[in-house]
């Protein structure tokens, strides 16, 4: 290196002229200052470093000697340890920002090797150094008289420092004295920036094939002096300061004499295989300064991902350059974690001057491709085309922050907050800078704290600015949520289209949600006189005119009459020809809407006039009035109201259907004159709901004068008749309709209130669809009849059948004024009306109905005409008209006849509590609509033309489409029940509900081992039915065969018997056997039974009562023992069982005891005499036991007859509630099984008393509730009282809870008591 430097000193001036020309081009470069507050110009280097702080002496002129001014050189005697300590992270930063407000006064220490090669002098000829963003430029000036040994030693020291073992990122830094402000920020320490004019050389080879490539060059031009002899020194130096040891085998030491820096630099410029090592991005440091003195250009760069792509050249004159902290977030990284690469280039001969110039020109970076916003530091850079291409490639792979394009978001490196706009990030970074400023170290109060993140601020304005960040973030989240909630319109190509707007979607759920939005937009019109609500104003006006008699102008009435006449003629022509020709225009009846498509009109009326107009199927024609059919008569509004009231009371008081159609009676039915048929109901879900929806709204008489309805009111409540006066002929067969008239050959009878009347039916081929007519009245005392319009004087037959009783039918009202319903109208009806299922109420006289079905022929049921008649039908026949526009259907319920004779339901028996039954008629051959009969209390039966095929079933069987389980045969009525059932399958199989579509049903069914019950038609499992049957059966099934204990459920008995088996040592048995079966098998075996008795006798345990707690709330009671009628004379009802002679003796004794009891003195004497009497009973029992074999007593037969049933209504007058039970103490020997002991209470325990031997020493006390005997000395009363207190607490008394009740303790077999068992009982009582 020394020889190399000496050759450079002897270079000619022509060599320098080339570089001087290049340097002169940089004179106009200026420094851009970005940070506010940097208002001072950049001072000279001698002003930045004081003698006190850094020990750098101010040069007096530019020609001072090296020995005088080069005082920044550290002694080379510093060990590597000291140099490493100097480079440690604990040391303060080395770059001091001259213009920043956070200038620290701390001294800095230069590590070993960071020697200054030249004097600290600045003249007017000093050149500026241009660098890329994130790089450090330094300008070196070295006088001519400086010995070359210093440069060599400096390079040697630098090389030694480079080859040192890496410890930390800060230990591998090469420290430079910068000529300008390097702007970087340490997150933990304040940054210090030092302007320098020293140069540092490195004698490290940068080979092309090495794993560390140089991405920048350091070009040091050594200033010779004012005499013009400049020395150009170009050297390649790679400074790899990284936190990770990247290997030092690629470096060359100073002893390598074969190193040619010029050739290597040319090779670096010309090669295309250069790669750029990527490292984590750090703060970008750059500086520029225009110097009036000729200086060689030097540049220092670092390894970053940006590859100089964001650099830009912004010249300025002697201005301090600061970091734009608000535009970039990467400048917050520490300076000691950066990487630099130094290079020196020096051509050897003047022949390569042009080549060198070309190389420098190729290094000039095009600033047009640099985004001004992407780099906080704008510097100029020299790059080759190869490096530019590779930088562009690396930029495409790098994060969006370093891309030339606008990034999608701006992240903050201090916290996890992203910003879409740069200004928001700038504002956010101000708070981070504020927290790391020197004010943080001062005791400045920060009373303002953010509630959301907890940051504190000095003033309120800062807090308000900070809160904008959270507010904008919330707004952003709300916008995203709002976008998610908005329903996406898929356009007209979607499968589901909204009929009210242009919304379309393929998702049914989305379509339903969209439909709900239209419901919110609806406006309802409320009636002031009632609770009626209308969707349209026209509907409200019609309601007021019909229900309240208000004078309103209906838009339908005031419509163009001529237009409707034209429509009527067109329709009549089409009705004769057939349904092939159709009207071209369809007009809505409620609004001026017209359309040529019938389906469009249907949807229009369905969605817009669904509640105001019953005809939602939009039949535009066929409702026109005919003058020939009109009998203009005044309308009595009072009779209209009477009819409305009568119709509202048609249903039973508690009928569910009345609740369902309550609004229909008050609202929709009044406007039903505008239509004939109601809209098609939705899918039937429930039986009750299906009945309500299957009927059409009831028609009320219209009170408007223009309506063709005549209602004659009679003061004497004479019946009113409605009938058809004229009919017009049409092509019936073409329309598949029939005319129903009287048929004289066959007379059908209607039985009403014990009287019968003839019904005439006549069949005729040519007819119209107006074959069914309703003749009803508005009076509760009227009768309905059937008559012939052409022969009104037809007489009644003299003979008829009294037993005929038929069901109440639903009918369609057909008015006289409407002549026919053609094919056009019929096409507008829904398909379900063509094949309508008829459901009518079944009268409970099924036997007579069956007879009538057998006597009728099929021809009589084909076509009939239904009319109404009364006892004065012929004499008082007065015909009036009814508008066909009132054609409606409605289901009619009729409750069962309470006063029905028992013989009437012999064939088909119905329970009186079963509710409604219906008859099912299916008529698909002709449109035989049902007929409606008003006033069911007076008119019970009517007849209609229905098909012969019928069936009777309960109303719960009407419904519904059963849903079957895919894993078992169970069926369900609702999807909710099926879903819960399927969840049970999946839960037992260990699967989640979502896995039902993944796993096959066969696998789930096989893995589910639970026994399933097939559901019946009503969805009730068989298991529940079995429970109901068990409750209704005799309770003797739940009696323990061993001890006689009774239980209300089989489960309680099973648990009780399980305790018996456990005490007997039987703890294991077959899984398919119940404990009750195991005990019965053991008792059937006599040997095992004897062992059981011995085992039980060996345990001296006080027996417990077996009284179910549910008995207190039940109506009957099953006692353990039998209380005969003679015992208490209280009239208790007992079952008659065989009583042995011994039992009779016991009963006689008990009766004698009852007779002698009133003579006994009260008080203590009564108790003592009772004890004496008990001892007598003991002797009597011993005498009886001597005559009866003990073995026969304990056999199984005696056990079975032990317990009897007794119905004890526990009323207040029952003597069991107040009188002590009269029982023989000898009866308790049968209760010899061990019962579960109750929990012992806290306190003193009962002492086990020895069995006394004398009768005078023993007191025997008995419990009046359970009959338990307490035997012992006088102190036994204490236990007896405590026992009674438990009963009182748990007794069925007011405000004491339901618990034990008073029972009898008398047994039926006193002869079965032995001396041994009695002594055992005494011992148990004493214990």
Swiss-Prot record:
Molecular-function GO term, any one: transcription corepressor binding
Cross-link (Glycyl lysine isopeptide (Lys-Gly) (interchain with G-Cter in SUMO1)): 346
Keywords annotated in UniProt: Disease variant, DNA-binding, Isopeptide bond, Metal-binding, Nucleus, Phosphoprotein, Repeat, Transcription, Transcription regulation, Ubl conjugation, Zinc, Zinc-finger
Organism: Homo sapiens
PROSITE patterns: ZINC_FINGER_C2H2_1, ZINC_FINGER_C2H2_2
Compartment(s) where it occurs, according to its Swiss-Prot or TrEMBL record: Nucleus
Effect ascribed to mutating residue 369 to M: In MYP21; uncertain significance
UniProt cross-link Glycyl lysine isopeptide (Lys-Gly) (interchain with G-Cter in SUMO2), position: 39, 82, 112, 168, 185, 193, 213, 263, 284, 294, 299, 319, 339, 344, 346, 388, 390, 485, 509, 553, 573, 589, 598, 603, 627, 641, 645, 658, 676, 712, 718, 720, 727, 733, 762-763, 791, 795, 817, 835, 843, 962, 1009, 1031, 1088, 1094, 1110, 1133, 1157, 1165, 1176, 1192, 1205, 1234, 1308
Sequence ranges of Basic and acidic residues compositional bias: 788-801
Family: Belongs to the krueppel C2H2-type zinc-finger protein family.
Name by which UniProt lists this protein: Zinc finger protein 644
Region described as Disordered: spans on this chain: 126-147, 779-804
Tissue specificity annotation: Expressed in liver, placenta, retina and retinal pigment epithelium.
Zinc finger intervals, C2H2-type: 410-432, 448-470, 496-518, 525-548, 586-609, 963-987, 1038-1060
Impact reported for residue 242 to M: In MYP21; uncertain significance
Associated clinical condition: Myopia 21, autosomal dominant: A refractive error of the eye, in which parallel rays from a distant object come to focus in front of the retina, vision being better for near objects than for far.
GO CC terms, sorted: nucleus
Effect on the protein of changing residue 305 to K: In MYP21; uncertain significance
Signal sequence range: none
